[in-house]
Amino acid sequence: MLPAQEYMRIWQGGENTRVPLTEVTYASDGASFTADGVTYKTSQVDSITFVHIITVTWDGTQATVEKGNVLDVDTSVSAGDVVINSTNTHNELEFVLQGACSDGSLTYTGSYKCKFYLNGLNLTSQKGAALEILCGKRIDLILNAGTENVLADASGGEQKAALYCKGHLEVEGSGSLTVTGNARHGICTKEYLQLKRSTGSITVNSAPSDGIHVGQYFLMNGGTVTVSGQKGDGIQTEILTLDDDITPNPDKEYNGQIFIHGGSIDVTVSGDDKKGVKSADKMTISGGTVKVTASGAGSKGISVGKHLLINEDNATTLVEIRATGGVYEDDVTDDETKCTGIKVTQNMAITAGTLRVANTGSGSRGIKVDGVYYVGLGTTVSAKFTKGSVKTDTIPPMD
């Protein structure tokens, strides 16, 4: 990708073709145009949008920004720290981030959807987040094929994560991303986090709090996610609320939920009362591999705030949980909680797939379901349900 280029997207039937503006010529009567050697009839084109590419390159201690003549975008650079403010509300911006810097960062503020391509980026901040996207719209994060990308934030500061997105973060691309959290979370999104089928690998290797912390919901269709070294939970969702900080926001769909439809998750969590995967609401595993190793008093492999459904949609499902630990007693409330492989607050249904849960430690439990649970024919389940869990012969309500 060349820096600071303008492109045209030609939309037909929901699909689009992107061509450089320099490769577009128009017929004198306006009935057609030729883009990159292909002629289009104007009447057969659904719409046309324009894209401007901005390239940010870090080289040692200095960053440079190539933005050409793009309008409504202000940039400032101080050594390796880059701040970009956009008031653009009509053309989609695309940013290519590349190079290496041990004292650098990027903070982007805008109010329109945009894309960030990580093209071999190795960025460590000494002041705050490495990559902070302050835009509440849809943000596409593309891990360019064949690239390794590394982000780490400062050990101090008020940043929420090494990689923080205020909006809806959708990840794709077959490259890799390794994140080190030094202040709070490794990766944090205020709205949903979605990993598309084409996603490569994402690794969070440490964080003082959660490895991956997500508002609204977490949706995984592909990719490989590895989380370890965090002192909080491995992957956690939260329910977005209204201004009273109590009432769930009714406008946020799938609020607090986790969906695993494909890919591979491997989470290691260690510490008292910590969870490998924690869903604030319902959780659905319908494909892929989920492996969690949890150790510590009161630790949980998977903790679900409402219902848990395990089935198979378009891919095989394998869930393996290992939980080791005893009973945790809260110093303030004196409440006790036991180490548990899977803890479900409401109902649980296993209609397809393979589930293995192993638990060790005094008072530890395999699976604890506060509602009722169902195990369908043809499933492979190797786990012990606690005596308080009630089995049913029909699939229980999962709404």
Question: Which sequence ranges carry the predicted segments?
Answer:
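Residue-level detector of beta-strand face positions
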Residues: 9, 32-34
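Structured surface patches comprising rigid loops and adjacent beta-strands/short helices at the edges
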Residues: 20-30, 38-51
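A composition-driven surface/loop motif
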Residues: 52-399
